[in-house]
Amino acid sequence: MMENFKHTTVLLDEAVNGLNIRPDGIYIDGTFGRGGHSRLILSQLGEEGRLLAIDRDPQAIAVAQTINDPRFSIIHGPFSALADYVAERELTGKIDGILLDLGVSSPQLDDAERGFSFMRDGPLDMRMDPTRGQSAAEWLQTAEEADIAWVLKTFGEERFAKRIAHAIVERNREQPMTRTKELAEVVAAATPVKDKFKHPATRTFQAVRIWVNSELEEIEQALKSSLSVLASGGRLSIISFHSLEDRIVKRFMREQSRGPQVPAGLPMTEAQLKKLGGRELRALGKLMPGEKEVAENPRARSSVLRIAERTNA
């Protein structure tokens, strides 16, 4: 059954404007979600334009399949494989723009059955594609305490990671957790100092979700693939929602905008320097939501949009 959860696309106009749409261009929306960005891109394309959308969430695919437009196609899979999708269509080096809206979507958070939120009781799942891989419950039941602590510290920046990991393992030993409410209660009980502005399970849920979905590895692979996929002058327009995501995007754009780094004083001929190649991208800056958007959609508060352009290198 199709859910009917509201989803407000964050930085909608800004992210699409960042692509610098050409009517006859070929674009990728790597995170279709509920189609906000895709529909706006399609509205700016001419008859010769094309849009390839990607999502690993079956519910997003169901929404995408309602779009009856010959310029549009949808792929069920991870955006980390975008280079493969493009190669299969013989479009490598011909893509004029890639848009990524990272992290979990509002419909995923709001649907208790998906298991993403500690605010709503549901199955402890957290998979963006429930047809593949381990659920959060399965992973927490089989993982070593030290591994759980590492995930909470690394992906949740949780200062009580060891204490929480121990509590999770002890609880699963007594009776395996299968519900989001159970995990939230265990984390809250194991957290000695409470933040009055944030639920104690916030960081744990973020960390487990990122781990279960390999989110940061997905981002790194997609960014790396973008260099071979984009045409000269093609744009990257990427929205991040937390510091771990934004750090990866920022570092990638900065490094690819600098070009190869040669140690000072190292003697190199012009031919050798040319062989190293020039910079791959030109960073065009970042944007953040305005006060009005944040007031209308509080989830936009932490979002950051970064834009870069493929060079001739």
Curated annotation (Swiss-Prot):
Enzyme Commission number(s) of this protein: 2.1.1.199
GO CC terms: cytoplasm
Transmembrane among keywords: no
SUPFAM superfamilies associated with the record: Putative methyltransferase TM0872, insert domain, S-adenosyl-L-methionine-dependent methyltransferases
Keyword NAD: no
Binding-site positions, S-adenosyl-L-methionine: 35-37, 55, 79, 101, 108
Reaction(s) the record says it catalyses: cytidine(1402) in 16S rRNA + S-adenosyl-L-methionine = N(4)-methylcytidine(1402) in 16S rRNA + S-adenosyl-L-homocysteine + H(+)
GO biological process, one term: rRNA base methylation
GO molecular function, one term: rRNA (cytosine-N4-)-methyltransferase activity
Localization annotation: Cytoplasm
Entry keywords, A to Z: Cytoplasm, Methyltransferase, rRNA processing, S-adenosyl-L-methionine, Transferase
Gene3D superfamilies reported in the protein's UniProt record: Putative methyltransferase TM0872, insert domain (1.10.150.170), Vaccinia Virus protein VP39 (3.40.50.150)
Database matches in NCBIfam families: 16S rRNA (cytosine(1402)-N(4))-methyltransferase RsmH
Family classification: Belongs to the methyltransferase superfamily. RsmH family.
HAMAP family to which the protein is assigned, alphabetical: 16SrRNA_methyltr_H (MF_01007)
Protein function: Specifically methylates the N4 position of cytidine in position 1402 (C1402) of 16S rRNA.
Name of protein: Ribosomal RNA small subunit methyltransferase H
Organism from which the protein derives: Salmonella typhi
